[in-house]
Amino acid sequence: MTNEFHHVTVLLHETIDYLDVKPDGVYVDATLGGAGHSEYLLSKLSPKGHLYAFDQDATAIEHAKKRLAPYIEKGMVTFVQDNFRHLKLQLEKLGVDEIDGICYDLGVSSPQLDERERGFSYKQDAPLDMRMNRHADFSAYQVVNDYDYHDLVRIFFKYGEDKFSKQIARKIEQARQIKPIETTTELAEIIKSAKPAKELKKKGHPAKQIFQAIRIEVNDELGAADESIQQAIDLLAVDGRISVITFHSLEDRLTKQLFKEASTVDVPKGLPFIPDDLKPKLELISRKPILPSAEELELNNRAHSAKLRVAKKVHK
């Protein structure tokens, strides 16, 4: 296990500055990770303000406690070790029914990718795992070895958008008939063997999309994000804001759709007024996603696929 939890925060200032932080407000970092967003947000709060920081990874919380120690001493932080799909439930337990802002940094964090034994990366040999919550029973091993051909094709297409999903699923099926597929390196080699030679010459690792698909399936990432963002929109006070960083098209599409549904209203034309229960809850702060600056892209390779979407609560 690595001793340090290194993580270069993506879109740090944009994500928090767009929240328009109120010094005495109540805020949530739904994806604590390396605590970069939390630390910057806390720097904008007075001792009367409060941050609730969620992460299902105990390691992330332990490291964040060191980084955020000055704010913890002032009683400004509450840590919640749980999947953010339980956002509303956990906040209710803490007596919180309204928040002034919330930020999300979706997907796997850099420390999780870099920690070899977590099995997230196709670049390092490790047991097939990919669990964000280490106490969960379901891992990448079960997906790769227990899912039938049709289920593998389904998740590879749906979550990896890989056009060679059928060929890869077939190769996996053949390989595990000989022996179980146990490591990330074994899986990466099987994926490579299923792709044509000209595909292997293209930029990017040939296993990237499939590893993404398995990771999303293991952690139900899109289902959790869908539930959590909808809960967050309901929890926001009027004028409260939500920031969501995404790293691939599936996350971005989901966020865009949820924001669109909450910021538009479907009423008959010519209606003299819109009833309160039909008024849009959100207003988009930016119609197009906010992208990292050229300077950030130069400093942080992970930022290249990042997109930030922000919205404001305008009606309960």
Swiss-Prot record:
Documented EC number(s): 2.1.1.199
Coiled coil, from the record: none
Subcellular localization(s) per the UniProt record: Cytoplasm
Ligand binding (S-adenosyl-L-methionine): A35, G36, H37, D55, F84, D105, Q112
Cellular component per GO, a single term: cytoplasm
Top-level EC class as recorded in UniProt: transferase
Catalytic activity: cytidine(1402) in 16S rRNA + S-adenosyl-L-methionine = N(4)-methylcytidine(1402) in 16S rRNA + S-adenosyl-L-homocysteine + H(+)
GO molecular function: rRNA (cytosine-N4-)-methyltransferase activity
GO biological process, one term: rRNA base methylation
Disulfide bonding pattern of the chain: none
Signal peptide stretch: none
Pfam families: Methyltransf_5
Residues annotated as transmembrane: none
Keywords in alphabetical order: Cytoplasm, Methyltransferase, rRNA processing, S-adenosyl-L-methionine, Transferase
Function: Specifically methylates the N4 position of cytidine in position 1402 (C1402) of 16S rRNA.
Family, as annotated: Belongs to the methyltransferase superfamily. RsmH family.
Protein name: Ribosomal RNA small subunit methyltransferase H
UniProt source species: Streptococcus gordonii (strain Challis / ATCC 35105 / BCRC 15272 / CH1 / DL1 / V288)
Gene: rsmH
